[in-house]
Curated annotation (Swiss-Prot):
Keywords: ATP-binding, Carbohydrate metabolism, Cytoplasm, Galactose metabolism, Kinase, Magnesium, Metal-binding, Nucleotide-binding, Transferase
Amino-acid positions noted as binding ATP in the UniProt annotation, renumbered to this chain: S68, G122, S123, G124, L125, S126, S127, S128
Gene giving rise to this polypeptide: galK
Recorded superkingdom: Bacteria
UniProt-annotated catalytic positions: D172
Cellular component, GO annotation: cytosol
Subcellular locations according to the entry: Cytoplasm
ATP-binding among keywords: yes
Transmembrane segments: none
Record field: catalytic activity: alpha-D-galactose + ATP = alpha-D-galactose 1-phosphate + ADP + H(+)
Name the record gives this protein: Galactokinase
InterPro entries linked to this entry: Galactokinase, Galactokinase_bac, Galactokinase_CS, GalKase_N, GHMP_kinase_C_dom, GHMP_kinase_C_sf, GHMP_kinase_N_dom, GHMP_knse_ATP-bd_CS
Top EC class for this record: transferase
Species this protein is from: Chloroflexus aurantiacus (strain ATCC 29366 / DSM 635 / J-10-fl)
Amino acid sequence: MYELSTLYAAFEQYFGHPPTRIARAPGRVNLIGEHTDYNDGFVFPMALDRATYVAARPRNDQIVRVFSIKFRDEDQFDLQQIVRDERRQWVNYIRGVAKGLLARDLPLRGADLMIDSDVPAGSGLSSSAALEVAVGYTFQLLNNINLLGEELALVAQGAEHTFVGVKCGIMDQLIAALGEAGHALLIDCRDLSYRPVPIPAEARVVVCDSGVRHRLAGSEYNQRRAGCEEAVRLLKPALGKIQALRDVRSSDLAMYGHLLPPDLLPLARHVVSENERTLAAAEALAAGDLVKMGQLMVASHVSLRDDYRVSVRELDTLVDLALAAPGCFGSRMTGGGFGGSTVSLVAADHVDAFVAAMVDGYAIRTGRKLQPLVCTAGAGVSCVYASEEE
């Protein structure tokens, strides 16, 4: 469990005075619904009990000073002149959020910020969105700003679009802002409506980090998003008023798929079928049908591997090992892909045997050390420390 006292002491030592607020925003694991969010589709994530923490104290000027414990690096910028840092990507998440809040005509004053996290970076658990939402919420606390969770998520997403250069969907930021303990959230990424679904007590969610790291910015992620948008353009003459692949059904693709070139048809097929799987998965989990939920997770992985082509050998190995391990209902890659993690749904009374089988199997197959995370569905962003001093 993360020790707030360690962050408090580090802040006081570095800045010379104690923090007045500490905020946390969780990482997330997506149970199913991958690469659907930027297609106006459905996703089914849960917030984790792993989080990014921001200790903060307001200043009397317009300067923001930041120190990242994880990167052992510092940044300083002026709220009146926020520009991208071309060398260091991590600082752009923070600068972008500040810029986004100011763009909404929200008054900000300078601040000292110290950031730490126990969300593994690059593992597909959305450490970046946790950072954005935690920083945005911290600025809210320091400046007496009241944004709805959905609004905070949109500010955070905008930071990633404009300052980081990744055209991400809204899922990661939304679950970081709105997560509910003990539940996954079925989110409609078109209108941002959501429905909490309880995770049955007899099930556990286990995340396995492949150890393979991805770089999303400027990579194949943006190419796939562009491909999906092109598929919509090509299908519009036949299907009429479609705005995104969310509006296309499998039966539509069966009839009009010939309108798409060979490189785009598999992309569209994945997104369309994944939306259908995600809605079915929420119903299955709500009914406590873990077998059905697991089957849908496996079908999702096959689609991500074969049609969307975002899996890698290590992720496929983890899924194969999981499906052969004791008590596993289903397993799939989770996150953007090209590395990162898998998520498995496991019977609670088989978790220890499952974890042992995964560790041994992955070491034999790849020579890599695996540290599976048995995850609890956590709450969304919150203030975890507030002093009486302002």
